[in-house]
Amino acid sequence: MRRAALLLTIALPIAANADIVDIKWADGAFTHRASIAPKKFLEVCGKQKMGDVVGWTFNGSAAADFNIHYHIGKDVSYPENRKGVASAEGSLVAPLDQDYCWMWTNRSAQSLEMEVRLKQAKVEK
């Protein structure tokens, strides 16, 4: 019993510092704030349809590696990939129906704070 409690004490903080967050749109917008522990990541993921446009912006307290990616089988495609940036903005035009993830990796020895904002653009069909 003691061993199980000790393992939980060790495992829970590790899992809590590598976050995967589902995008929950509210009136076409999504905002998320998180602390990213050293050598951990934050990933914000959601389903987009081909042609959907999502404006994105983020501000961090320190530089992180950033990408937007999606998986097709074992292959990973990166519509956006930047190294060592504390803030950036842009837009994603979804090339196909897929789950897309915005991801930040903290390669430093210090925690960093991150604020992410996504906004769905209205697309004329």
Predicted regions and their residues:
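Hydrophobic h-region of N-terminal signal peptides that target proteins for export
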Residues: 9-17
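Positively charged n-region of N-terminal signal peptides that target proteins for export
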Residues: 1-4
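Short helix-onset patch at the extreme N-terminus, typifying the N->h transition
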Residues: 6-8, 61
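Acidic, Ser/Thr/Pro
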Residues: 18-125
